[in-house]
Amino acid sequence: MSAFRIVIPARFASSRLPGKPLADIAGKPMIVRVLERVQDAGAAEVWVATDHDGVREAVEAAGGKVVMTRADHPSGTDRLAEVACALGWQDEDIVVNVQGDEPLIDPAIITAVAAELAADGEAAIATAAHPIHDADEVFNPNVVKVVCDARQRALYFSRAPIPWARDAWAQPGERAVLPAGLPVLRHVGLYAYRVSFLRRYTALAPAPIEQWEALEQLRAMWHGYRIRVLGLQAAPAAGVDTVEDLERVRAVFAGAA
């Protein structure tokens, strides 16, 4: 496939875990752990996008490249668009947005999502999803679900249980079990974008469904852009949102030392 780039957004002001990008993981800041992890994805360039001088200093000390961005972006996609414009990337270039709180991310998934977008010339975005096997996850509004068409393009993303098993879930008491064969997919928040789309995204009006669901990818779908979905066999390693998550990741790195 053609070359692609990686951008790692790193916001210092996390509501649940303040200062998260600089949290220590086995002697290195988390953002540096993520930076090291993605090197094996085969990207032409890797950049960290931040609005915090401490994060910039940590990345530069580790030999990484940094773009300083505005602090008031309404979404990660807007921040990515600023980076693409600042660095003068071309419309046909592909950029993968890797969250700065995923020090255990599998580089192969990053490569695969970029390849998925490169292979579908009609898609503006590519992302990933994996099967859900637990009914509690299906009915959890914090778990985003996606339904795809025959070409592995997203039909809709929702916090609601989709697709709905009408007959199997006719009664509330029957919803504790997933019907065999029900294709429920959990969305994974990893995105590849064409730069041409990023340039247009910032001018797109917010969509009603985006605002109701609080899912920014629905803005693209509302305005007619296609999203390709890479199917994963299993859930990837979880990111760091809480102190408990941070301790779990620290234990993994301690065990690998």
From Swiss-Prot:
Domain of life: Bacteria
Classification via SUPFAM superfamilies: Nucleotide-diphospho-sugar transferases
Pathway of action: Nucleotide-sugar biosynthesis; CMP-3-deoxy-D-manno-octulosonate biosynthesis; CMP-3-deoxy-D-manno-octulosonate from 3-deoxy-D-manno-octulosonate and CTP: step 1/1; Bacterial outer membrane biogenesis; lipopolysaccharide biosynthesis
Chief localization: cytoplasm
Gene Ontology biological process: CMP-keto-3-deoxy-D-manno-octulosonic acid biosynthetic process; lipopolysaccharide biosynthetic process
Catalyzed reaction equations: 3-deoxy-alpha-D-manno-oct-2-ulosonate + CTP = CMP-3-deoxy-beta-D-manno-octulosonate + diphosphate
Gene Ontology CC entries for this record: cytosol
GO MF entries: 3-deoxy-manno-octulosonate cytidylyltransferase activity
InterPro entries for this protein: Cytidylyl_trans, KdsB, Nucleotide-diphossugar_trans
Keywords: Cytoplasm, Lipopolysaccharide biosynthesis, Nucleotidyltransferase, Transferase
EC numbers, comma separated: 2.7.7.38
Top enzyme class: transferase
Subcellular location: Cytoplasm
HAMAP family: KdsB
Family statement: Belongs to the KdsB family.
Role summary: Activates KDO (a required 8-carbon sugar) for incorporation into bacterial lipopolysaccharide in Gram-negative bacteria.
Name by which UniProt lists this protein: 3-deoxy-manno-octulosonate cytidylyltransferase
Native organism taxonomy: Bacteria, Pseudomonadati, Pseudomonadota, Betaproteobacteria, Rhodocyclales
